[in-house]
Amino acid sequence: MLQLVFTNKFKKDVKLLQKRGYDMELIKKAILLLEVTGNLPSEYIPHKLAGNYTDYWEAHIKPDWLIIWKLFIKENEIWLTRTGTHSDLF
């Protein structure tokens, strides 16, 4: 099992989504899967990012709800860095 690290920006993103009425059970499920496996199943469409987010991964919790993370294998950590809509994040 990986150690979860929540960035301050991720925590703020979650609060904003809660305020907007998003179903937090969906992100909890995704986070649990990341914690256990380090990745998400294909239905989340996980993929690597490029540019400023090189070495980061993104997946879709819903079609316009994303989660971004970075895996640190040596440290046995997964950093949850951002979550939100495409327009929130990019």
Across the structure, where does each feature detected by a protein language model lie?
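Short, charged interaction patches at domain edges and termini
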Residues: 69
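Basic, Lys/Arg-enriched alpha-helical interface segments
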Residues: 1-64, 72-79, 87-90
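Residues forming the ATP-binding cleft of Hanks-type serine/threonine protein kinase domains
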Residues: 84
